[in-house]
């Protein structure tokens, strides 16, 4: 192993090499670190979107509710497919989960075959931004409907339902939080790709 000290010709003692003289880390090592961070982020993205999807589609709740014109309470279900906004949200989560899985596999392939990195990185960066737009818009749309379910809107006669369907609303809130986290991960991936191109 090479010594990190230089012998002084006058005294014969060794002097340590200054830190500035140490060689910089190899580009191959930094490439591996970047690819590993990218893969970890994409695995987190897949986990977040898949969990949000599962929570959303299992949010159904049935409660005995007094309906207008009916003398006795009747069972009424609250389901995600009652709202077009929630349906759009679920479809966006399906697409995002599938994309996260495919992009993770592509990133692993690029780690094993780095010669294709430049070509596929451009595609991944573009698709990351497209998925960010889709998922963020779906999250915002579903969040608006969820807020009405929580607070209601007396001016137009929309009653709040979260006081009755508490499990349904909790599940939707959890799914929205996970989707927001996934959107932030996509934003990080987009910024990461942009910075990687400049360096």
UniProtKB/Swiss-Prot annotation:
The chain crosses the membrane at residues 37-57, 86-106, 130-150, 172-192. Residues 1-27 are annotated as: Disordered. Residues 2-36, 107-129, 193-199 are cytoplasmic. The keyword Acyltransferase does not apply. Keywords: Acetylation, Cell membrane, Membrane, Transmembrane, Transmembrane helix. It holds the Pfam family CASP_dom. It is a multi-pass membrane protein. InterPro entries: CASP/CASPL (IPR006459), CASP_dom (IPR006702), CASPL (IPR044173). Expressed in the root endodermis and flowers. It comes from the Eukaryota. One of its GO terms (cellular component) is plasma membrane. Residues 58-85, 151-171 are extracellular. It is found in: Cell membrane. The modification N-acetylalanine is found at residue 2. Its main location: membrane. The keyword DNA repair does not apply. Homodimer and heterodimers. Belongs to the Casparian strip membrane proteins (CASP) family. This is CASP-like protein 1D2. It comes from Arabidopsis thaliana.
């Amino acid at each position: 192993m090479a010594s990190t000290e230089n012998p002084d010709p006058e005294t014969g003692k060794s002097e340590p090499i200054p830190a500035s003289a140490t060689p910089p880390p190899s580009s191959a090592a930094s490439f591996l670190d970047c690819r590993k961070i990218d893969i970890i982020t994409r695995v987190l993205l897949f986990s977040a979107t898949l969990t949000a999807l599962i929570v959303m589609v299992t949010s159904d709740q049935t409660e005995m509710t007094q309906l207008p014109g009916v003398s006795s309470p009747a069972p009424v279900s609250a389901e995600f497919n009652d709202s077009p906004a929630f349906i759009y949200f679920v479809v966006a989560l399906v697409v995002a989960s599938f994309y996260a899985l495919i992009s993770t596999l592509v990133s692993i392939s690029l780690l094993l075959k780095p010669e294709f990195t430049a070509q596929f990185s451009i595609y991944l960066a573009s698709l990351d931004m497209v998925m960010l737009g889709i998922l963020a818009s779906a999250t915002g749309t579903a969040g608006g409907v969820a807020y009405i379910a929580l607070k209601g809107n007396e001016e137009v006669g929309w009653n709040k339902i979260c006081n009755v369907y508490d499990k349904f609303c909790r599940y939707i809130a959890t799914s929205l939080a996970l989707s927001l986290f996934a959107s932030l991960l996509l934003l990080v991936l987009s910024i990461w790709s942009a910075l990687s191109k400049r360096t």
